[in-house]
Design a protein with these regions (language model features):
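Membrane-embedded alpha-helical segments in integral membrane proteins
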Residues: 1, 58-65, 133-140
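Membrane-interface "cap" regions at the ends of multi-pass membrane proteins
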Residues: 1-59, 117, 166-169
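Loop-to-helix junctions at membrane interfaces in multi-pass transport proteins
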Residues: 2-3, 38-40, 44, 61-75, ...
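Lipid-exposed faces of alpha-helical membrane segments in multi-pass integral membrane proteins
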Residues: 6-20, 79-86, 119-129, 157-164, ...
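Helix-loop-helix module between adjacent transmembrane segments
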Residues: 18-19, 50-51, 74-169, 223, ...
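Membrane-helix boundary/linker segments in multi-pass transporters
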Residues: 21-40, 94-105, 114-115, 264-282
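Hydrophobic alpha-helical transmembrane segments in multi-pass integral membrane proteins
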Residues: 52-57, 127, 134, 194-198, ...
């Protein structure tokens, strides 16, 4: 069975599981629809909260950001993890105790001010729409990747599926669906990380393999990444390029922004008691940490694999994933020196923010782009 068939099989099985759970646990009352009848156990709620928190931004973008930015990408780890700690310790239990479902409701009641409530609502709308835009883009990328459709089509498919789950099951159905989703998500994330860690460092624990020596070599993985990055014209992978004040304010913005997300806050109302809300927060932090501590390792493995797979490789011999990404618009190659080799280094390959594809193919079979090449550097990807 080829890779595409296996992808369809496993995705089909997971969606069948989600649909079955959504039907089995569908909401039968208003209480079920909005707060799952306050009958969810702390462990199940912790898993559902973790699945909520670790959406497309974490599952797809976290490792990608760290791979692209190097050590500077750690601000996103600190910001998103810190945001959850802020929410779990200082917001959610007290909102639950106060009896309000949202931050604007709490602020309006606590300060006896409709104006304060309105300001909080406006802030929350901006935060939520910014967050949802990223999530839906991530959904589109995932569906475009395995269905081989346009990203915009992938976004529409994802919206329809989410609408189906939300309307049918309400919070009760979504909660138990997300418990299953967390199990599938963490399995899908950890298994490749473990095997890649074994292949690269002979260490089965990605978090430790990240700082280990390369297999058959006395060179550490991060030292090798630093060396390759400098050779290609980038900053060393483990160097900071941002100032401490930038790091502080980016981390703070992420913390305060994500701490107020309504779809996560409402999770703390689905358990029977305030003490259970605190317990579920602790469980969720453990479940989230499992992925977040693996993300830097996945980023390093992906970066070194990307460089080894494409640098100075003939386009016709490029890995299948490279051409698949090209077909769905995730990557572009412009042969600036017309030698047929992929040359990856620092700088922009093309003029403009993103590639503008034509319907033509180049002489090596690559997708042609309308953008003019940027000849100020050697990068072709």
């Amino acid at each position: 069975m080829d890779l595409q068939s296996l992808t369809y099989l496993f995705v089909g099985i997971s969606f069948t599981l989600y649909i079955g759970i959504a039907i089995w646990s569908r909401a039968r009352s208003t209480n079920d629809f909005y707060i799952a009848g306050k009958g969810v156990s702390p462990i199940a709620n912790g898993m559902a909260t973790a699945a909520d928190w670790m959406s497309a931004a974490s599952f797809i973008s976290m490792a990608g950001l760290i791979a692209f930015l190097g050590k500077d990408g750690s601000v996103y780890l600190m910001g998103w993890t810190g945001g959850y700690v802020l929410l779990a310790l200082l917001l959610a239990p007290y909102l639950r105790k106060f009896g309000k479902y949202t931050v604007p409701d709490f602020i309006g009641t606590r300060y006896y001010s409709k104006a304060a409530r309105l300001v909080a609502i406006i802030c929350l709308i901006f935060i939520s729409f910014t967050y949802v835009a990223g999530q839906m883009r991530g959904v589109g990328i995932v569906f475009s990747r395995f269905l081989e459709v346009d990203i915009n089509t992938g976004v529409i498919i994802g919206m329809l599926i989410v609408f189906f789950y939300a309307v049918l099951g309400g919070m009760k159905g979504i909660t138990y669906t997300q418990v299953a989703q967390y199990c599938v998500l963490i399995f899908a994330y950890m298994v490749p990380a473990i095997f890649i860690s074994l292949l690269i460092t002979n260490n089965p624990i990605p978090q430790l393999g990240f700082g280990d020596k390369l297999i058959g070599s006395s060179t550490y993985l991060l030292d090798k990444l630093d060396q390759l990055s400098i050779e290609l014209g980038f900053n060393a992978y483990t160097d900071n390029t941002k100032s401490n004040i930038d790091i502080f304010f980016i981390t703070a913005a992420l913390m305060f922004g994500t701490a107020g997300l309504p779809h996560v806050i409402v999770r703390f109302f689905t358990v029977p008691k305030v003490s259970d809300a605190r317990k579920s927060a602790g469980y969720a932090l453990v479940f989230i940490a499992l992925l977040y501590t693996t993300a830097p390792a996945v980023a390093a493995f992906a970066k070194i694999n990307f460089i080894d797979s494409v640098q100075k490789v003939e386009y016709e011999s490029a890995p299948d994933w490279f051409k698949n990404w090209e077909n769905i618009g995730l990557i572009a190659w412009k042969d600036k020196n017309e030698d047929g080799l992929i040359d990856y280094s620092s700088g922009n390959a093309l003029e403009g923010i993103k590639p503008k594809y034509t319907n033509e193919q180049g002489k090596y079979g690559e997708r042609k782009v309308a953008n003019r090449p940027d000849y100020s550097n050697k990068n072709e990807v």
